[in-house]
Curated annotation (Swiss-Prot):
Binding site for NADPH: V476, T555, S556, K579, G798
PROSITE patterns: ACT (PS51671), ASPARTOKINASE (PS00324), HOMOSER_DHGENASE (PS01042)
Cofactor(s) needed by this chain: a metal cation
PANTHER family, sorted: HOMOSERINE DEHYDROGENASE (PTHR43070:SF3), PTHR43070
UniProt-annotated catalytic positions: K682 (proton donor)
EC number in record: 2.7.2.4, 1.1.1.3
Name of the protein in its database record: Bifunctional aspartokinase/homoserine dehydrogenase 1
InterPro entries: AceGlu_kinase-like_sf, ACT-like_dom_sf, ACT_Aspartokinase, ACT_dom, AK-HD, AK-HSDH_N, Asp/Glu/Uridylate_kinase, Asp/hSer_DH_NAD-bd
Amino acid sequence: MRVLKFGGTSVANAERFLRVADILESNARQGQVATVLSAPAKITNHLVAMIEKTISGQDALPNISDAERIFAELLTGLAAAQPGFPLAQLKTFVDQEFAQIKHVLHGISLLGQCPDSINAALICRGEKMSIAIMAGVLEARGHNVTVIDPVEKLLAVGHYLESTVDIAESTRRIAASRIPADHMVLMAGFTAGNEKGELVVLGRNGSDYSAAVLAACLRADCCEIWTDVDGVYTCDPRQVPDARLLKSMSYQEAMELSYFGAKVLHPRTITPIAQFQIPCLIKNTGNPQAPGTLIGASRDEDELPVKGISNLNNMAMFSVSGPGMKGMVGMAARVFAAMSRARISVVLITQSSSEYSISFCVPQSDCVRAERAMQEEFYLELKEGLLEPLAVTERLAIISVVGDGMRTLRGISAKFFAALARANINIVAIAQGSSERSISVVVNNDDATTGVRVTHQMLFNTDQVIEVFVIGVGGVGGALLEQLKRQQSWLKNKHIDLRVCGVANSKALLTNVHGLNLENWQEELAQAKEPFNLGRLIRLVKEYHLLNPVIVDCTSSQAVADQYADFLREGFHVVTPNKKANTSSMDYYHQLRYAAEKSRRKFLYDTNVGAGLPVIENLQNLLNAGDELMKFSGILSGSLSYIFGKLDEGMSFSEATTLAREMGYTEPDPRDDLSGMDVARKLLILARETGRELELADIEIEPVLPAEFNAEGDVAAFMANLSQLDDLFAARVAKARDEGKVLRYVGNIDEDGVCRVKIAEVDGNDPLFKVKNGENALAFYSHYYQPLPLVLRGYGAGNDVTAAGVFADLLRTLSWKLGV
């Protein structure tokens, strides 16, 4: 005997009803089957709404009409698709049921209230009609059917609206029915009868519980719960799209997961099948070929040590504390007795080892009643000051990690807490069962989904996510997007899910949290109407619970740089080649570092100096290892490296500058390069990295252009006038050559910490002597590197090398996941 249960979505319309009948027929070929059905989707909600509206004097007719329509369409569809379907008979039956519903609602309207016994009798009508209709379908297909009346056969004790079945007595009653072996068995879910023979319902998820009870009473070989998902997942796929489908789990794991909010099974459903060691298979009505998830007495040892992550939202936490707690016997008992009398379920408990406080969580909906019960129970203690005023924290959620393997595997809790910490989620309370099968944390309600996602990513080793927003898609930004597109297969092989979720230029912002199409982002951005807005990006991160959002600023904008601290505070990493932020005031410089540290986010700017050369990271590594910079000299501009190299080769200054501009080494207006300000900014960044508290105004700058030269006018006029400087530079080059030296545009930090940017004459022993053609070279003289310096040399200009450096920084944001 197998017991199959089908939920409301599985019998929502004629097509699905017939699919259920097909599944029953297929299973019946392997042995006798018993089936428990829910009401069609939405019907129970309509019945509940009818009662509530009638009590409050509102019009329940829309709900009645909608429910009648659902059944009318169901019957019509079945009659069209199933030969021999008894349409007239069942239409009469359904009409009689709705006539009875309307009659009872009229009585409720006269009373102005609905007794629980009447409430129970109304809200289970949908299940009763489902069974009658399924019996009609199966009989039309030539099957013998026995319908078990749950009110007669299942004895339940408890409240009218939430009863518990006495399995021993119910087993005896069903056995006395002597069901023929060739009959298909049907029973309405959600319903039972009390000792008076009155109808009662089995509470939330009552149909699942009915199926488990029937399986226990029949000592079935298996209980199958057919639903609209393929089985039990490691967490809710709506929260984590890459949640894994579990092949199997133990009864205890299923109990823990369901208790803490997993939607597939209710804890009461598991108790009967676990008691009688009946395997339970979770299957998908829409995908019957899927293997599903098997819940049983033991688990495969090769399975995951952690089976799932679940969450319960909308909780409130009460904390009872005070000197009167310590050493006083029975305080905990009084707390929970008060909750019991108020009929409030306590979801989580935690107590300090000092006995000074005890905290517990209840559903938010019970908060007012719970507080009243606690105030009444401890009235005297609160009045006399033996207890501190009750602390009530609302809008909380409980996140739980569950798995039998946690008992023998070290480090699960550490990973759990580390994931939450790196997502900036504060833990309010912690609880762990003595079985070591689960550990739960209480967090803010708004953090629940993010908490589940980061925990799942940490524990189940799914693809590491980087959600990138690129601001500025010109030279460097465009090259970066091209590199990201080109490297997608490499990233996938490394299990890195790098999505470009947004691109922006000075005119528009284009976003897609699932990732933009990198083949045609230019066309989409050209059509976008939304302007760039920090608030919009922050809302996206919060609304979609993005795990690892990164702002990549490829502009040279001071306005964007001024928003970095806000980005960091809102949970973004910031990666940028833009030097403006790091060369703003020292106050803002410190703000950025504080915001990054406080938010546990990274501010990465390795491309600020040397483009793709690993300058900043190597300097930081040296300083972190205890080294100290004594002095520094470097060629920090690719454009000026190119220009001064061409002067060595005999080219005039004006020709060299024109060629550098044509080759793309300089800015569109070469005056930006020739002013020396770009080199000064880079030198300031290096100086600040070594701990020097300097402002940009503290850098001594010798521009390439002499002060007496008229550099006014547009770019064309400026370029035309450059030939006036050819003789001056030719003379300086000749003088240096006579001394065995060359001209280089150099940034220096001397041993006194003074920073200068100037045209320098360097000899053949200097590491900068041979640097030209757009190369950068940086010579660090330190305690560890002397008398020969640490030299970093390579191309330090160009969109591709800068974009490559930004790409490398992007990958460094993954260290929050890797723990490095």
